[in-house]
Amino acid sequence: AVPHPLGRLLNTLRSSKALRSFDIAVRLLDLGVSTPEPLAAVETWKGLRTGAFYCCRWHTHWSRARELRADFDPRAEHATWALGVFIGHLHNLGVLHRDLSGGNVLVGGDPSTPLGVTFSLIDLNRIRFTSVGRRMGIANLAVLGHFHYTAQLLDGYCRERRLSPSWTCSRYETMLGVRRLRDTIWSGTRPLRRTLGL
Protein backbone atom coordinates (compact mmCIF):
# COMPACT_ATOMS: atom_id res chain seq x y z
CA ALA A 1 0.00 0.00 0.00
CA VAL A 2 1.19 3.49 -0.83
CA PRO A 3 1.43 5.61 2.32
CA HIS A 4 -0.88 8.60 2.64
CA PRO A 5 0.98 11.88 1.89
CA LEU A 6 0.30 13.17 5.43
CA GLY A 7 1.71 9.92 6.85
CA ARG A 8 4.81 10.28 4.67
CA LEU A 9 5.31 13.83 5.95
CA LEU A 10 4.91 12.78 9.59
CA ASN A 11 7.27 9.82 9.11
CA THR A 12 9.85 12.20 7.63
CA LEU A 13 9.73 14.38 10.75
CA ARG A 14 10.81 11.56 13.07
CA SER A 15 13.86 9.36 12.76
CA SER A 16 13.50 6.28 10.57
CA LYS A 17 13.34 2.74 11.96
CA ALA A 18 16.70 2.12 10.30
CA LEU A 19 18.39 5.04 12.05
CA ARG A 20 16.76 4.13 15.39
CA SER A 21 17.93 0.52 15.01
CA PHE A 22 21.50 1.65 14.30
CA ASP A 23 21.59 4.05 17.27
CA ILE A 24 20.05 1.45 19.60
CA ALA A 25 22.54 -1.22 18.46
CA VAL A 26 25.47 1.08 19.26
CA ARG A 27 23.99 1.86 22.68
CA LEU A 28 23.34 -1.83 23.45
CA LEU A 29 26.91 -2.75 22.55
CA ASP A 30 28.14 0.07 24.81
CA LEU A 31 26.10 -1.52 27.63
CA GLY A 32 27.66 -4.92 26.91
CA VAL A 33 24.46 -6.40 25.43
CA SER A 34 25.00 -8.57 22.37
CA THR A 35 23.37 -7.60 19.09
CA PRO A 36 24.59 -8.11 15.51
CA GLU A 37 27.27 -5.51 14.76
CA PRO A 38 25.69 -2.42 13.15
CA LEU A 39 27.30 -1.57 9.81
CA ALA A 40 25.15 1.22 8.34
CA ALA A 41 21.80 2.98 8.33
CA VAL A 42 20.85 4.38 4.94
CA GLU A 43 18.05 6.82 4.17
CA THR A 44 16.97 7.89 0.69
CA TRP A 45 15.41 11.29 0.17
CA LYS A 46 13.50 12.97 -2.66
CA GLY A 47 12.16 16.06 -0.90
CA LEU A 48 10.77 13.72 1.76
CA ARG A 49 12.35 10.51 2.99
CA THR A 50 11.45 7.82 0.47
CA GLY A 51 13.12 4.85 2.09
CA ALA A 52 15.48 3.61 4.77
CA PHE A 53 17.28 0.40 5.61
CA TYR A 54 19.57 -0.91 8.32
CA CYS A 55 22.57 -3.17 7.68
CA CYS A 56 24.22 -5.34 10.31
CA ARG A 57 26.59 -8.29 10.41
CA TRP A 58 24.71 -11.59 10.21
CA HIS A 59 25.02 -14.01 13.14
CA THR A 60 25.64 -17.50 11.79
CA HIS A 61 24.82 -20.71 13.67
CA TRP A 62 22.37 -19.05 16.06
CA SER A 63 18.86 -20.27 16.78
CA ARG A 64 15.86 -18.31 18.01
CA ALA A 65 14.58 -18.36 21.58
CA ARG A 66 11.14 -19.54 20.40
CA GLU A 67 12.76 -22.91 19.63
CA LEU A 68 13.22 -23.39 23.39
CA ARG A 69 9.44 -23.27 24.03
CA ALA A 70 8.62 -26.92 23.38
CA ASP A 71 12.10 -28.42 23.62
CA PHE A 72 12.34 -31.22 26.21
CA ASP A 73 16.12 -31.50 25.90
CA PRO A 74 17.97 -30.92 29.22
CA ARG A 75 20.16 -28.39 27.41
CA ALA A 76 16.99 -26.42 26.62
CA GLU A 77 16.15 -26.43 30.33
CA HIS A 78 19.45 -24.71 31.14
CA ALA A 79 19.18 -22.37 28.12
CA THR A 80 15.66 -21.34 29.22
CA TRP A 81 16.95 -20.58 32.72
CA ALA A 82 19.81 -18.56 31.18
CA LEU A 83 17.26 -16.69 29.02
CA GLY A 84 15.47 -15.62 32.21
CA VAL A 85 18.79 -14.37 33.62
CA PHE A 86 19.48 -12.50 30.36
CA ILE A 87 16.06 -10.78 30.29
CA GLY A 88 16.45 -9.89 33.97
CA HIS A 89 19.87 -8.41 33.22
CA LEU A 90 18.39 -6.33 30.37
CA HIS A 91 15.71 -4.99 32.70
CA ASN A 92 18.31 -4.19 35.37
CA LEU A 93 20.19 -2.17 32.73
CA GLY A 94 17.00 -0.28 31.83
CA VAL A 95 16.56 -1.98 28.45
CA LEU A 96 12.93 -2.68 27.52
CA HIS A 97 12.43 -4.55 24.22
CA ARG A 98 8.81 -3.75 23.40
CA ASP A 99 8.76 -6.51 20.76
CA LEU A 100 10.29 -9.22 22.95
CA SER A 101 9.13 -12.21 20.97
CA GLY A 102 10.91 -15.54 20.80
CA GLY A 103 12.00 -14.61 17.29
CA ASN A 104 13.78 -11.43 18.35
CA VAL A 105 16.20 -13.11 20.77
CA LEU A 106 18.94 -15.22 19.22
CA VAL A 107 20.50 -18.09 21.20
CA GLY A 108 24.03 -19.37 20.75
CA GLY A 109 26.13 -21.83 22.70
CA ASP A 110 29.27 -20.27 24.18
CA PRO A 111 31.28 -22.35 26.67
CA SER A 112 33.45 -19.32 27.48
CA THR A 113 30.55 -17.46 29.15
CA PRO A 114 29.50 -18.09 32.77
CA LEU A 115 26.09 -19.39 31.62
CA GLY A 116 27.46 -21.49 28.74
CA VAL A 117 24.87 -19.82 26.50
CA THR A 118 24.80 -16.36 24.98
CA PHE A 119 21.91 -14.27 23.69
CA SER A 120 21.67 -11.51 21.11
CA LEU A 121 18.84 -9.05 20.41
CA ILE A 122 17.49 -8.26 16.95
CA ASP A 123 14.63 -6.12 15.59
CA LEU A 124 15.81 -3.24 17.73
CA ASN A 125 13.70 -0.26 16.65
CA ARG A 126 11.11 -0.80 19.43
CA ILE A 127 13.64 -0.92 22.28
CA ARG A 128 13.34 1.82 24.89
CA PHE A 129 15.84 2.77 27.58
CA THR A 130 13.92 3.38 30.78
CA SER A 131 13.64 2.26 34.36
CA VAL A 132 11.97 -1.18 34.28
CA GLY A 133 9.95 -1.86 37.43
CA ARG A 134 8.74 -5.27 38.63
CA ARG A 135 5.32 -5.14 36.98
CA MET A 136 6.62 -3.73 33.71
CA GLY A 137 9.37 -6.34 33.66
CA ILE A 138 7.02 -9.29 34.22
CA ALA A 139 4.58 -7.96 31.59
CA ASN A 140 7.51 -7.71 29.17
CA LEU A 141 8.70 -11.23 30.05
CA ALA A 142 5.18 -12.60 29.42
CA VAL A 143 5.41 -11.40 25.81
CA LEU A 144 7.80 -14.31 25.21
CA GLY A 145 4.90 -16.69 25.84
CA HIS A 146 4.78 -20.06 27.57
CA PHE A 147 7.84 -22.33 27.65
CA HIS A 148 8.04 -26.02 28.54
CA TYR A 149 10.57 -24.93 31.19
CA THR A 150 8.67 -21.83 32.35
CA ALA A 151 9.67 -22.49 35.98
CA GLN A 152 13.33 -22.26 34.96
CA LEU A 153 12.71 -19.08 32.94
CA LEU A 154 11.09 -17.43 35.98
CA ASP A 155 13.75 -18.78 38.34
CA GLY A 156 16.53 -17.23 36.26
CA TYR A 157 14.62 -13.94 35.98
CA CYS A 158 13.90 -13.81 39.74
CA ARG A 159 17.49 -14.62 40.60
CA GLU A 160 18.84 -11.84 38.39
CA ARG A 161 16.30 -9.23 39.54
CA ARG A 162 16.11 -10.43 43.18
CA LEU A 163 12.34 -10.88 43.06
CA SER A 164 10.03 -13.14 45.06
CA PRO A 165 9.44 -16.30 42.98
CA SER A 166 5.84 -16.76 44.23
CA TRP A 167 4.85 -13.16 43.39
CA THR A 168 6.62 -13.34 40.03
CA CYS A 169 4.97 -16.64 39.06
CA SER A 170 1.51 -15.37 39.99
CA ARG A 171 2.00 -12.10 38.10
CA TYR A 172 3.46 -13.93 35.09
CA GLU A 173 0.46 -16.29 34.84
CA THR A 174 -1.90 -13.30 35.10
CA MET A 175 -0.06 -11.48 32.32
CA LEU A 176 -0.10 -14.59 30.10
CA GLY A 177 -3.88 -14.80 30.60
CA VAL A 178 -4.31 -11.14 29.69
CA ARG A 179 -2.19 -11.62 26.55
CA ARG A 180 -4.23 -14.69 25.50
CA LEU A 181 -7.47 -12.74 25.94
CA ARG A 182 -6.11 -9.76 24.03
CA ASP A 183 -4.88 -12.00 21.19
CA THR A 184 -8.27 -13.76 21.01
CA ILE A 185 -10.11 -10.43 20.80
CA TRP A 186 -7.61 -9.09 18.28
CA SER A 187 -7.92 -12.08 15.94
CA GLY A 188 -11.71 -12.27 16.39
CA THR A 189 -12.19 -8.65 15.38
CA ARG A 190 -9.84 -8.80 12.37
CA PRO A 191 -12.66 -8.96 9.76
CA LEU A 192 -14.42 -5.96 11.33
CA ARG A 193 -11.19 -3.97 11.56
CA ARG A 194 -10.43 -4.73 7.90
CA THR A 195 -13.92 -3.62 6.88
CA LEU A 196 -13.47 -0.37 8.79
CA GLY A 197 -9.94 0.10 7.44
CA LEU A 198 -8.33 -0.08 10.89
Where are the language model's segments positioned?
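Conserved ATP-binding subdomain of kinase catalytic cores across diverse folds
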Residues: 1-63, 85-93, 97
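Flexible, glycine- and charge-enriched loops at secondary-structure boundaries
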Residues: 11-18, 73-77, 134
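A short, glycine/Asx- and small/polar-enriched loop/turn
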Residues: 48-52, 113-118
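Short, glycine/acidic-enriched loop or turn micro-motifs at the edges of active sites
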Residues: 60, 102, 126
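AlphaC helix of the protein kinase catalytic domain
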Residues: 64-73
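Conserved alphaE helix
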Residues: 75-86
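Hydrophobic residue at the +6 position relative to the catalytic HRD Asp in the kinase catalytic loop
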Residues: 100-110
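C-lobe/activation-segment region of protein kinase-like
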Residues: 117-196
